[in-house]
Regions:
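C-terminal, non-catalytic "cap/extension" segments appended to globular domains
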Residues: 394, 402-405
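Acidic/His/Gly-enriched intrinsically disordered linker/tail segments
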Residues: 297-306, 310-393
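Surface-exposed patches in mature extracellular/periplasmic domains of secreted proteins
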Residues: 234-241, 334-343, 405
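Long amphipathic alpha-helical segments
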Residues: 223, 237-241, 355-361, 396
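Juxtacatalytic substrate-recognition/specificity segment
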Residues: 188-316
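Non-catalytic architectural context of zinc metalloproteases
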Residues: 35, 57-66, 70-236, 249-252
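Early extracytoplasmic/domain-onset interaction patches
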Residues: 9-51, 121
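Hydrophobic h-region of N-terminal signal peptides that target proteins for export
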Residues: 1-6
């Protein structure tokens, strides 16, 4: 057993009580308080580094502010690891049975005056030395009393501003984002006769932003039906498509086992503007497909027992490429895209890859090993981008054609 594992092997009983508070949405700062059961002695804690679906060690540790540890009413000295800025060392004093952890997290691109898109890995520390599936957390969220929320987490209680969720392992918590807002709408997408509920939860900066049409709603209903017809299975108790419709938050999506965290590129105009809807229509099918390909089943090397160990992303052409292919197929089969739009999207990606000069020197597998979502656009054709999405889709189209021939 390593020294770090040895000093943390004394995992204390009881769940960690984690509270994230947003007292002033206009301030865009989350106030974090953890109460962690401990025993005296050396303790090492991690801030989540390798977040599943990000494919790189990009946990926003640089945004953490005001970190403070205390026990028995006394503030404790702590030290960051010299070789890993995501790791913190401290000593729990004799007689202490719980550790209080406090810090602030400025959530610039996930909070507006009307909404919050919360991912728990931004607001938690966890113990080194034991798998995250063995570390229980009971999360609470404090938001304005008139806000509503959606999540795959099960609610224990709500008392005014405070929502307390039922305890879950830390890996499940990180896999279960929450959206909340003044303007909230939930659609039940559950197919007739099914006991497994699927929901589309929406938040926006205005009531108009979440005004989905009857036709769009029907298409999302068909998405669930078509996914069931494609996969012939489900592996979740329920599923929540969490959709943020704001012009003031980050864009894109992140997959989770029982939910997806989707932020429309069209923002508040996604449902109102047909052009924006066409651009965003494949986002939710893509992340929903990941519940099968990437969560329920994932390539070797992309599963780790905690969020500190590096992933081995060599098979991202399977994880992402196959998901693009199947997700876009579901987008068309559900009616979110027309068949012509699907063909146009595929033709565009094929044209881009056919003229990708960087393929002469850089193989596809290297783009999976050196993932860089923040790479500049300059010289992208020669340098290559994260082509395991586009070229991966074309590869799986070829595989599908081979199987069918």
């Amino acid at each position: 057993m390593s020294c770090m594992a040895a000093e943390n092997a004394q995992t204390a009983p009881g769940p960690v009580a984690l509270t994230a508070s947003l007292p002033d949405p206009g301030q865009k700062i989350l106030y974090v308080h953890e109460v962690m059961p401990v025993t005296p002695g050396p303790l090492t804690l991690y801030y989540p580094k390798w977040i599943p679906g990000d494919h790189s060690p990009d946990g926003p540790i640089g945004d953490m502010m005001g970190l403070e540890f205390s026990a028995n009413g006394q503030r404790l000295t702590w030290q960051r690891d010299e070789l890993d800025r995501f790791t913190f060392h401290l000593t729990v004093p004799e007689g202490a049975r719980q550790l209080d952890i406090r810090f602030e997290f400025p959530s610039r691109d996930r909070v507006t005056t009307n909404l919050l898109d919360l991912t728990w890995d931004h607001v938690a520390l966890y113990r080194a030395g034991s798998p995250t599936k063995d570390q229980m957390f009971q999360p609470s969220l404090v938001i304005p009393a008139d806000w509503h929320y959606g999540s795959a987490l099960q609610t224990d209680t709500r008392d005014g501003k405070r929502i307390t969720f039922k305890p879950v392992p830390f890996n499940t918590l990180v896999d279960s984002p929450v959206i909340a807002g003044k303007h909230f709408r939930q659609l039940d997408l559950t197919p007739k006769g099914s006991s497994v509920h699927r929901y589309l939860d929406m938040i926006g900066d205005s009531a108009a932003a979440i005004a989905i049409s009857d036709q769009q709603s029907a298409d999302f209903h068909r998405l669930i039906e078509q996914a069931q017809a494609l996969f012939h299975s489900h592996h979740y108790d329920s599923y929540h498509l969490l959709l943020t419709l704001s012009d003031h938050t980050a864009k894109g999506g992140l997959e989770h086992h029982q939910s997806s965290d989707d932020k429309a590129r069209g923002g508040s105009k996604m449902f109102a503007d047909p052009a924006h809807f066409m651009l965003d229509a494949s986002l939710l099918p893509h992340e929903y497909t990941h519940s099968w390909n990437g969560k329920f089943m994932r390539p070797k090397g992309l599963w780790r027992s905690d969020f500190e160990q590096p992933e081995k992303p060599k098979l991202l052409w399977v994880y992402e490429g196959l998901t693009v292919y199947l997700g876009d197929t579901l987008t068309a089969r559900s009616g979110l895209w027309s068949p012509e739009t699907w063909r146009d999207a595929l033709a565009y990606r094929a044209a881009v890859m056919a003229h990708r000069t960087g393929r002469a020197w850089r193989p596809l597998v290297d783009t999976t090993i050196a993932v860089d979502y923040g790479a500049p656009e300059a010289w992208a054709n020669w340098r290559r981008q994260n082509d395991f999405y586009r070229e991966g889709e074309l590869l799986w189209l070829a595989v599908d054609m081979k199987i069918r021939s």
